[in-house]
Amino acid sequence: MGKRISRTVPVAHTLLGSLLAGASFSAVAQDQTLPAEALDWQAWSQDEAPQQLCRGRYVMPAYRLPAEENPETLSVETREVDYAADGEALLRGDVVLRRGDTELQAERVFLPADRQQVDAEGNLAIRDGQALVRGEQATLMLNEDRASLRNSHYVLYDQHLRGQASQLEQTGENQYRLQEATFTTCDPDVNSWQLVG
């Protein structure tokens, strides 16, 4: 196992806001499922279960990195990092980035020299306290409210809803576009009903 590396550097503006406010749906999503644990699902205890309609709830796990005093600061933890002479960085192995309330986990992350965007791939998860998005690949613009994820699954914790999309794009503050998407409030592995668009 490699040595863990942590580093903190300042950056500007937001990484990813709360998800799906005003989202538009188009086409039909691929039928892939994730295990309940991968969607931050927790079953009710035996004492809680009789009073509940559903079998559990979505609960965000604790952040892996501590909050920084300056919410614009980008904190990074990884097993390996390669720096190029021009300032580019490739982070590999259990990469975690946190900025404000948003935390990104992935197997590989590429940071260009200008640090204006993050390209992440491999078992990625983005959490911001209100939502979880999992996907295969993501590009996040660090100085703008823009992001793009392919083959994503999403959860809104407080609304008890989940879905998936072949493409999820944040096009501005609280503006999202989903392609080939689904939406449901059913428990994981249960699709008694869902919207498909």
Regions found by a protein language model. Give the residues of each.
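Gram-negative bacterial Sec-dependent N-terminal signal peptides
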Residues: 2-28
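Structural signature for solvent-exposed beta-strand/loop edge elements and short helix-capping sites
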Residues: 30-197
